[in-house]
Design a protein with these regions (language model features):
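Output/docking surface of receiver
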Residues: 18-20, 43, 66-134, 151, ...
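Conserved phosphotransfer microenvironments
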Residues: 2, 11-13, 18-65, 69-80, ...
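Generic recognition of short, well-ordered alpha-helical segments
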Residues: 51, 102, 137-140
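Hydrophobic, Leu/Ile/Phe/Ala-enriched alpha-helical segments that form helix-helix packing faces
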Residues: 56, 107, 111, 142-150, ...
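Generic structural signal for beta-strand residues in well-ordered domains
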Residues: 9, 30-31, 58, 83, ...
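Short alpha-helical interface elements
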Residues: 50, 63, 81, 112-115, ...
């Protein structure tokens, strides 16, 4: 992950704290200050992950909870039987560090969207995709493209303050996994959207 940050000219890579059980996660959240996100690995034998997500959301509604899993038909079947409302996003993860970087940047963009897009006028790209497997593939590539382009711009002769402003003004990425969220984000930020990326089949299906 540190190498990914370095390659993309990003500063302040996140610090990760690893625990093995839901009980350890609860204890950590109660004792450690400054945790910005919870990432949880899931397999079909897990029984506590969904109750843990609900507990965390009840205590800290604004703390992002992300589920990482190796997707298969059995995983899809198990997830369909669970209440996943407390989980912000699910991602298909196969050990690729670039996905972790994309997840961190996605939530940073979401957190800063109101100020940067609506307030300052920073542009944005809206990705509309309901397939966990597909958006888990798209996001890392999309962020790499944007961040590498930003890095190229920073090779120009700029002072430190100008570099900081240019980094901050890169296009934000917004992810919608259903039609209602996509429409809401579009209506809210349409004046600053560079474009919308979506599966045509998804749009036709949702549009009737």
């Amino acid at each position: 992950i540190y190498r990914e940050y370095t390659d993309l000219n990003l500063s302040n890579p996140p610090k990760f704290i690893w625990v093995q059980t839901a009980a350890q996660a609860r204890e950590l959240l109660n004792t450690v200050v400054g945790i910005d996100m919870v990432m949880c690995m899931y397999n079909v034998s897990d029984k506590e992950v969904f109750s843990l997500a609900t507990e965390i959301k009840n205590d800290r509604p604004n703390l992002p909870f992300v589920l990482l899993t190796h997707f298969s038909k059995e995983v899809y079947r198990r997830l369909a039987l669970q209440d996943t409302s407390a989980i912000d996003y699910m991602f298909c993860w196969h050990g690729n560090a670039d996905l972790i970087v994309a997840i961190v940047k996605l939530f940073e963009d979401l957190q800063n969207a109101e100020h940067d897009i609506s307030g300052v006028g920073v542009q944005a790209i809206l990705l509309v995709e309901d397939s966990v497997r597909y958006y888990s593939t798209y996001l890392p590539e999309l962020y790499k493209l944007i961040l590498m382009q930003t890095r190229e711009f920073l090779t120009e002769t700029l002072n430190q303050q100008q570099r900081k402003i240019r980094k901050r003004s890169r296009p934000k990425i917004l992810l919608a996994t259903n039609y209602d969220d996509a429409l809401s984000m579009y209506e809210k930020y349409k004046n600053n959207l560079l474009g919308v990326i979506s599966d045509v089949g998804f749009c036709e299906h949702r549009g009737g």
